[in-house]
């Protein structure tokens, strides 16, 4: 009877947990639909800004923001995008694994999301700055504020390189940790077929220096929004798997309970029959 009582408790607990994971799956699905529209609009905006900025870069020869042969990368600031909440599968762990595999002793962390703060504090890694005010209503104004801080760190020479590590959204079941260099900017060797269509005043370099804030805030906004949609997709998938596993566990426990109960009833009947036979004998 003790075993039956224990199995019944396990079944009840599994059902309760299943209700929670199913509810979390529904919430994540709703957030995914909401932010999915935002990421589509954001990707279009980011694409346009990139196109314009790349044109400026092609016409620029010298700038502290451009990579050249003299650049010596000794100290990198890693901007790590994590979530504020857990229960989202390997979303945070995969990003942090990519960071650690490239991290040097002199490097520091700019932690975005409370999970990043706790992860690197636990590893005794120096956090230069942090931002935990990141939810699905993350705004371009917030991205600009972060961008201004990063620009200050790089312009002052405090860091030789700034890299963002975030989760790139591919589809609802596929997302991968991605490393993106922000500074110094690599000037791609391309044929300048559109040179005659652009004129920069007073110079391309001056335009670059003035436009770099827009470039940086756009990257920050785009990567965080893309990370957020990946987070919700990862959480929905994790909770769906947890719910399905819970149902399977509940099914197996129910079978075990019924077998134990049947064995108990059979034993009781056997004892009654044996007792009756003894009395009759």
Curated annotation (Swiss-Prot):
CDD domains: F1-ATPase_gamma
This protein's UniProt keywords: ATP synthesis, Cell membrane, CF(1), Hydrogen ion transport, Ion transport, Membrane, Transport
Predominant place of localization: membrane
Entry's localization field: Cell membrane
Membrane-traversing stretches: none
One Gene Ontology CC term in the entry: proton-transporting ATP synthase complex
Membrane topology classification: Peripheral membrane protein
MF (Gene Ontology): ATP binding; proton-transporting ATP synthase activity, rotational mechanism
Biological processes, Gene Ontology terms: proton motive force-driven plasma membrane ATP synthesis
InterPro entries cross-referenced by the UniProt entry: ATP_synth_F1_ATPase_gsu (IPR035968), ATP_synth_F1_gsu (IPR000131), ATP_synth_F1_gsu_CS (IPR023632)
Stored NCBIfam families: ATPsyn_F1gamma
Subunit text: F-type ATPases have 2 components, CF(1) - the catalytic core - and CF(0) - the membrane proton channel. CF(1) has five subunits: alpha(3), beta(3), gamma(1), delta(1), epsilon(1). CF(0) has three main subunits: a, b and c.
Family the UniProt entry places it in: Belongs to the ATPase gamma chain family.
Role this protein plays: Produces ATP from ADP in the presence of a proton gradient across the membrane. The gamma chain is believed to be important in regulating ATPase activity and the flow of protons through the CF(0) complex.
Designated name of the protein: ATP synthase gamma chain
Gene designation: atpG
């Amino acid at each position: 009877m003790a075993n039956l009582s224990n199995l019944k408790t396990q079944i009840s607990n599994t059902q309760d947990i299943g209700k929670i994971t199913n509810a979390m799956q529904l919430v994540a699905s709703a957030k995914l639909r909401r932010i999915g529209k935002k990421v589509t609009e954001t990707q279009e905006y980011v694409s346009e800004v990139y196109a314009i900025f790349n044109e400026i870069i092609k016409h620029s020869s010298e700038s502290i923001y451009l990579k050249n042969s003299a650049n010596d990368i000794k100290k990198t600031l890693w901007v790590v995008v994590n979530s504020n909440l857990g229960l989202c599968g390997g979303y945070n762990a995969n990003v942090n694994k990519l960071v650690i595999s490239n991290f040097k002793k002199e490097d520091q962390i700019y932690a975005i999301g409370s999970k990043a703060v706790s992860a690197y504090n636990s590893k005794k890694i120096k956090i230069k700055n942090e931002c935990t005010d990141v939810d699905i209503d993350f705004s371009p104004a917030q991205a600009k504020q972060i961008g201004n801080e990063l620009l200050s760190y790089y312009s002052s020479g405090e860091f030789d390189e700034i890299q963002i590590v975030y989760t790139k959204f591919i589809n609802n079941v596929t997302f991968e940790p991605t490393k993106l260099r922000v500074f110094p900017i690599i000037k791609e060797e391309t044929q300048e077929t559109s040179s005659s269509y652009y004129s920069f005043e007073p110079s391309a370099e001056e335009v670059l220096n003035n436009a770099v804030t827009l470039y940086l805030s756009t990257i920050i906004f785009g990567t965080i929004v893309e990370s957020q949609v990946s987070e919700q997709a990862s959480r929905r998938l994790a909770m769906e798997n947890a719910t399905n596993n819970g149902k399977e566990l509940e099914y197996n426990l129910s079978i075990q309970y019924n077998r134990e109960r049947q064995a108990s009833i059979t034993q009781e009947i056997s004892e009654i029959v044996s007792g009756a036979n003894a009395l009759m004998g």
